[in-house]
């Protein structure tokens, strides 16, 4: 569907092509998932022939997407100024680890690094050991934000004919998911710690073991809590100060989880 997309890799193939190999030739599951309906080619953009191919592609393209640090883009002639000299209407979307300015601009990084630096790992698992989420949500969220920004840039180009630079970074994306915690800490000086699956700002919100497996219950807001107290036969909890609102229920979540566990 949609655009014609050409993925360009190094001559030997990029590393991500072979992560979690599932095919006879070693191609990885995520590579196959993310490259459906895409075209592909390999080249070396630092060689004359590779540069000629890149130039021809840029001349007829609307968008270039790259996940390389700024110095690397410049060394390959893929920086925005050079691309714009070839095609004034080009849109360059770059997704780096830490952005294109600042002390970390030239560093590379992975999903897990952003999870760690954003504080997300400190709020995952238990308080004894920071825990990384298995699913690379920062990678996927960064790509989604990049796609959103790119489409807005493309809509603007259709109106004005002008291209522009779109930038996302893994750390910015990860911080987007933890900003509420950082804001709370800055304003209220609240320093939260991981509490496994139990939420800290509402309840019941936790995982519970039943006779035939585990379930997750997530309750936010007074109406749902009232329904839960009716289910538990604990209507008197509605007048208990410990459970008067979401935050109070989160702070006393261990009591709510204990009651829910008994019911399960």
What are these regions (language model features)?
Residues 136-151, 170-178, 220, 224:
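Mid-domain beta-loop-alpha active-site segment that forms a flexible
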Residues 143-164, 176-188, 229-236:
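Oxidoreductase and adenylate-handling cofactor-binding alpha/beta cores
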Residues 115, 164-167, 218:
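Glutamine-centric residue-chemistry signal
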